[in-house]
């Protein structure tokens, strides 16, 4: 059962190491990272290992995998992850989320890391709003890290013209290649 695999028992394939290194880099610089692979290749496990290794005194992390939701529901999930009230309209939740993200970054010195798994199912309105959430202080600072993880189809979604502004903000992008011949023989 893959759920029972402990982080300490991880087989560190080339893909695992590449993703781990890129996640560490993204953690430091903040911004958007995209990770794609076919099902069962270890993306979610690598995310779990990364999240488990975060110092909770230095980072606040949320893992969201219910990606087939409306924009309103997405905002509710994000509010809940940030410890905010979610009973308001979209514009109030958006404002509250941006204020909390800035507070965590600037005042608390505990930047937020948002992991969105199964991101290939996010609708285009959520993708557009993610770009707007990244706008802080007239784009002069990235207050948080956004990790979009999904199947290879996510790359095609991000290549669409409508997602150009979001795509331009991606600072880390990695596509899993699968086990090497050497890794298979080991």
Where are these regions (language model features)?
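Walker A/P-loop nucleotide-binding motif
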Residues: 29-49
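Conserved catalytic segments around the Walker B and adjacent sensor/switch elements
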Residues: 56-66
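Conserved AAA+ ATPase "SRH/arginine-finger" region at the nucleotide-binding site
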Residues: 64-67, 158, 171-183
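Short regulatory helix/loop adjacent to the ATP-binding pocket of P-loop NTPases
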Residues: 51-54, 154-169
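Conserved Walker B catalytic segment
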Residues: 32, 102, 109-148, 161
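Conserved NTP-binding/hydrolysis module of P-loop NTPases
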Residues: 59, 69-88
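Conserved alpha-helical scaffold flanking the Walker A/P-loop in AAA+ ATPase domains
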Residues: 22-25, 91-107
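A short, basic N-terminal segment
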Residues: 1-30
């Amino acid at each position: 059962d893959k759920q029972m695999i402990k982080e300490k028992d991880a087989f560190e394939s080339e893909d695992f190491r590449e993703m781990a290194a890129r996640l560490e880099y993204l953690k430091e610089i903040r911004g958007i990272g995209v990770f794609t692979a076919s099902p069962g290749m270890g993306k979610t496990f690598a995310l779990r290992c990364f999240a488990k290794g975060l110092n909770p005194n230095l980072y606040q992390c949320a893992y969201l995998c219910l990606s087939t939701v409306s924009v309103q529901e997405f905002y509710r999930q994000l509010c809940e992850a940030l410890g905010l009230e979610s009973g308001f309209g979209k514009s109030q939740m958006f404002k509250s989320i941006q204020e909390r993200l800035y507070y965590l970054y600037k005042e608390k010195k505990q930047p937020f890391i948002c992991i969105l798994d199964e991101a290939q199912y996010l609708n285009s309105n959520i993708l557009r709003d993610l770009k707007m959430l990244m706008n802080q202080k007239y784009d002069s600072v990235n207050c948080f890290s956004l990790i979009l993880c999904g199947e290879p189809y996510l790359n095609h979604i991000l290549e669409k013209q409508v997602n150009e502004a979001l795509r331009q903000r991606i600072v880390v992008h990695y596509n899993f290649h699968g086990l090497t011949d050497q890794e298979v023989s080991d």
